[in-house]
């Protein structure tokens, strides 16, 4: 098993080197939109609220990285703008946790947004897919698929 993981990791590194692009897991979904960060961020917030869920928190990742850069000896600016919106849905959260109590790990649900200094005007919006272990059964898989559809809908709405 370790040998297979090592081969897989080596393939990912080679692929990333050859393409010059990061290799993302299929568990991270990203969409791109040209525009201003503030406009797309506004649309993302509206898309979350339109689903009827309660926003629990919002974070400014770019600000946090800037604020802590000196503390960790960082000299690179990763993002021009970056943030997240965390939210809960009584319907979807309950279905996830009724299927398996361990699914609490997926709550709250989070969508992210960022713009890098290298590609101004290219706004990335995305989310991490709620992928449950296969041994959790069909109820967890269905609940996770429903949450995935909700997150996909929010992101699609923000970038249309």
PLM features per residue range, with description:
Residues 125-160:
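C-terminal partner/receptor-binding element of secreted or periplasmic proteins
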Residues 33-41, 58, 78, 137-140, ...:
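Solvent-exposed, acidic/flexible segments
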Residues 10-20:
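Bacterial N-terminal signal peptides
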């Amino acid at each position: 098993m370790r040998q297979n993981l090592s081969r897989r990791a080596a393939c990912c590194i080679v692929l990333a080197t050859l393409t010059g692009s990061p290799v993302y897991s299929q568990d991270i979904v990203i969409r791109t939109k040209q525009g201003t960060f503030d406009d797309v961020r506004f649309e993302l917030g509206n898309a979350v609220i339109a689903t009827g869920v309660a926003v629990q928190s919002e974070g400014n990742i770019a600000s946090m990285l800037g604020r802590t850069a000196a503390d960790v000896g960082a000299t690179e600016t990763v993002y021009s703008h970056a943030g997240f919106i965390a939210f809960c849905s009584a319907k979807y959260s309950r279905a996830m946790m009724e299927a398996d109590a361990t699914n609490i790990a997926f709550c709250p649900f989070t969508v992210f947004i960022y713009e890098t200094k290298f590609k101004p005007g290219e706004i990335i919006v995305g989310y991490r897919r709620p992928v449950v272990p296969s041994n959790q059964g069909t109820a967890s898989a269905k609940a996770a698929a429903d949450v995935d559809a909700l997150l996909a809908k929010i992101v699609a709405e923000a970038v249309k």
